Amino acid sequence: REDSPSGLFTRDMLTQLDAVFQRMAAPLVLKLYLDDTALSAELETYMTQLCALTEKLTLVKEESMDTEVADIQERPCVRICREDGSWTGLAFHGVPGGHEFTSFVLGLYNAAGPGQTLDEETLRRVRSLPAVKMQILVSLSCTMCPELVTAAQRIAAENPLVTAEVYDLNHFPRLRERY
């Protein structure tokens, strides 16, 4: 198999992505919330190329600049949604590249099902958690962040009261300064 035409995905990445897509139990919709920045254009290109690799992913650009939903104020953003358009609780603000690409793909797998295996006790505890909105601030060069992101997304995929929103700190200095 050749590299993707855009050069975004290597042959090895395409093989690994194909294996994940084949195991996904349900289709997903990736909703993009963009602005007029170069970063938004990069996210749109990245997600367009990713969705072109499988029929299990559909891309939707949300044109509205409505900021009723707090996280949409921080653009660009991709929300992982179910086929009916309802939000799974997983979102990435920025472009999920670098070390975060794998955790983003695992988030897709966990949201679509069957997801990474959890033992019964862990599953029971995750499902009993109260409402929590996790905001995870990462650096794409961080080697420790993907494990935290994957765990948070796994919890959010399993519990409808939990959300896991990941932010690339390089592009959201207000959050970096605040926390």
Model-derived regions, located:
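Non-catalytic, surface beta->alpha helical segment in thiol-disulfide oxidoreductase systems
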Residues: I80-G115
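Auxiliary Fe-S-binding modules of radical SAM enzymes
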Residues: R1-S4, L8-F9, R178
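Long, contiguous hydrophobic alpha-helical segments, chiefly transmembrane helices and signal peptides
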Residues: V78, F92-G94, L148-A152
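Local sequence-structure signature of Cys/Sec-based thiol-disulfide redox active-site neighborhoods
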Residues: G7-Q49, L53, R127-A164
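Long, charged amphipathic helices and adjacent flexible linkers at domain junctions
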Residues: P114-L129
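Feature detects long, helix-prone N-terminal segments enriched in hydrophobes
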Residues: P5, F21, M65, R124-V126, ...
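Thioredoxin-like thiol-disulfide oxidoreductase module
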Residues: T48-D84, L161-Y179
